[in-house]
A protein has these predicted regions:
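ASCE P-loop NTPase motor core, strongest for the SF2 helicase catalytic module
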Residues: 78, 83-119, 127-209
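Conserved helicase/translocase motor-coupling segment
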Residues: 2-122, 193-200, 206
Length: 209
């Protein structure tokens, strides 16, 4: 087994390897789609609870709203890409095994290794704990988004150069004020996500095979 961060080659031909989702995989996909519907709904509610949006749905802070929406959409796209790759892994592994049995060498090009996510997860592990084994699942990307980017901090309206804009609300000690409603919305989204079956990443499945 050899690994390389970059690989050059020519004369390569590509063919389609089709994977038919099983009924169980379709059910899991639909469940995650439902969880994202909850996250999207809770995100809109949290933007109102924190003061980014007003009661009518109009925004008081276009930059804050655009940032929250952008992070959500990029997380959603990355998640479903990794989820589908994880579901395709069994078919990929069988093709690799067939090629190896035929005496061929297999080159696997991995677009994302999840290295940055793994580093963040390791940073949360106590230095005294023994790390026996661990695995990353696509839903960890979503949990990371909810923990780090979901809007929970209250905003206040201030006038700057004649324009009303929103900025983070701070308490007397200078700490950011957390909206309890937004915090509850985030917790509900995380709880629903954690109840769903984790699908190991494609890379982990290939390494374990």
């Amino acid at each position: 087994l050899y690994t390389a961060r970059a690989l050059s080659f020519d004369g390569v031909e590509y063919d389609v390897l089709e994977h038919a989702l099983t009924p169980a995989q379709i059910e899991i996909y639909d469940a995650y789609a439902g969880a994202f519907r909850t996250i999207h709904h809770n995100l809109e509610a949290a933007l109102t609870a924190t003061g980014v949006n007003d009661a009518s749905g109009e925004t008081n802070a276009s930059a804050a709203r655009a940032s929250a929406k952008s992070r959500f959409e990029s997380t959603k796209q990355r998640f479903f890409n990794h989820l589908l790759m994880g579901m395709k892994a069994p078919t990929i592994i069988r093709a690799i095994e067939d090629d190896l049995a035929a005496g061929n060498a297999c080159v696997i090009q991995v677009v994302s290794t999840g290295e940055s996510l793994l580093k963040r997860r390791l940073e949360t592990v106590d230095s005294d704990d023994e790390l026996v084994e661990g695995a990353l699942a696509p839903r960890d990307y979503v949990l990371g988004y909810l923990e780090q980017a979901f809007p929970i901090h209250a905003q206040k309206l201030v006038e700057i150069d004649g324009n009303m804009v929103a900025e983070p609300l701070r308490d007397e000690a200078g700490a950011l004020v957390v909206s309890r409603e937004a915090l509850a919305l985030r917790g509900a989204a995380m709880m629903e996500l954690m109840t769903l079956a984790p699908i190991p990443s494609a890379l982990d499945q290939i390494l374990w095979a």
